[in-house]
Each structure stands twice: as structure tokens, then as C-alpha cells.
Amino acid sequence: MSDILQKICAVKREEVTAALAAKPLAIVRAEAEAQPAARDFVGAIRGRITAGRPAVIAEIKKASPSKGVIREDFRPADIAPSYEAAGAACLSVLTDKPFFQGAPEYLQAARAACALPALRKDFLVDAYQVYEARAMGADAILLIAACLSLAEMQDMEAIAHGLGMGVLVEVHDGAELEQALKLRTPLVGINNRNLRTFEVSLQTTLGLLPRLAAEADRIVVTESGILAPADVALMRENGVNAFLVGEAFMRVPDPGAGLRALFG
């Protein structure tokens, strides 16, 4: 695990301890179970791909540890419908405060402003956060293989599926991919950003594809570094049709127009 990831995960464990003290697990679990049915995150992605179109998980992100503030004019309730009109399949909304200046309220505002399923983009280290995600309205969660043991991922996945949520498992290398393929979720995200150096290489996705050749039911989601139509074309030529993109859209005045420009 990289230094930045270790630091983030340590802060997350502190957040969970504080959250548990403020709101016991039984209460947040009841809140999660009382939510209306989740929107179908996996189905939205699969539907786009089946129709021969790219499935775009469009991200709503104000800042990042490596880049600082990415978007000053940050209004999730305006960004989400802009993405929806441009053809996004799903949303990804940062809820991490200390590192990405995100908030649960951003996810709620974005989801309320459109009909798209929304992923809680955060660093999950405890099952409490899975219930918390559904309680705030998230339709899917992210599990980062670098942060979690296989047993932890399996436990969180089972809880998420029990709550009707989708799961995106994120990997960075072959060892993490081997663990991810032991989960039930079809969604395997490959992050092209090296979390140790913050360098981005699309070869990360391309290099892991041979290991997924026999996994017909898996959907590869390429994450980070999709900045130009040529990047999209390269991925689609190699059979990758699902994309998680944020920064490229956040840096232009109209994020929906950015999505259209990138994916045609």
C-alpha cells in the first residue's frame, strides 16, 4: 500500500470510530434498510455496453490530494443532470472530506437532480461505511483492493448486495486482480494511476486484460487518464467499454459538453 493510501485509510478508520460513537451500527443499518430500492448500477453499465455504446461513470469531484482544487464552481445538483443529458450511464460522487473535499451531501444533491445510479466514491475500510453509503442514498460502493483483505472485501460485498447495491472493485496490479476475481461482482475497475507516484499509464489496463480474457461475465472499467478521444478509441479497440472519468470533465465549464466531446 502506498504512503498516501496508508494515510487515507488510517484517517478513515478514525472517521469510522467517531461515526460509531455518534451513531451506533444498529441505527445506521436501520437507516440503510429503510431506504427506497437502489437504482441498478450494474444494469445501467451493462445496458450501455449491450447497446454497443461506451458506459461512462461520470465523476463529481471538487479536489484531489495530487491536484488540489480542480473545480471552483462546484454545484453537484447542476453537474449531475448535465452528465445525464450527455449520456452518462452512472455517477461517481466523492464523499471523502479530508483529501478530496467531498461530502455525503454532494452525493445526495447529485442523485436527487437526476435518475442515474450513484456510486459512493470513498475509501471503505469497515462494514459500517457500507451501511452508511446506502443510508445516504448511494446505489453502489467502491472497494479498493489495495486497502482491504479478501475477507474484508467479501464481507462488504455481501452486505452491499444484501442492501441491493452494486459493487465496483478497484485494482492496480495483477496480485490485486487475482483477489478481485474471487468476488461476485462483475465490475472490475483498473486504476491507471500509480498511487505511489501518481503517474498515469493506460498500459496498466491493457497489461491486465489478458488475465481477464477467460472472465466472460466481468466488465472492465478503466479508471484515470482517459483524457482524449484517442484514449477512448484505444480502450474500445481492446474490448474495454466502461470508463470512470472525472477530472477531464471537471476542468471544463460544462461537464456534460466535456463528456460529449470525449465520447462523441
UniProtKB/Swiss-Prot annotation:
GO terms for molecular function: indole-3-glycerol-phosphate synthase activity; phosphoribosylanthranilate isomerase activity. InterPro entries: Aldolase_TIM (IPR013785), Indole-3-glycerol_P_synth (IPR045186), Indole-3-glycerol_P_synth_dom (IPR013798), Indole-3-GlycerolPSynthase_CS (IPR001468), RibuloseP-bd_barrel (IPR011060). Pathway: Amino-acid biosynthesis; L-tryptophan biosynthesis; L-tryptophan from chorismate: step 4/5. Pfam families: IGPS. CDD domains: IGPS (cd00331). It comes from Azoarcus sp. (strain BH72). It comes from the Bacteria. This is Indole-3-glycerol phosphate synthase. PANTHER family: INDOLE-3-GLYCEROL-PHOSPHATE SYNTHASE, TRYPTOPHAN BIOSYNTHESIS PROTEIN. It is an enzyme of class 4 (lyase). Transmembrane segments: none annotated. GO terms for biological process: L-tryptophan biosynthetic process. Gene3D superfamilies: Aldolase class I (3.20.20.70). It catalyses: 1-(2-carboxyphenylamino)-1-deoxy-D-ribulose 5-phosphate + H(+) = (1S,2R)-1-C-(indol-3-yl)glycerol 3-phosphate + CO2 + H2O. Its EC number is 4.1.1.48. Keywords: Amino-acid biosynthesis, Aromatic amino acid biosynthesis, Decarboxylase, Lyase, Tryptophan biosynthesis. Belongs to the TrpC family.
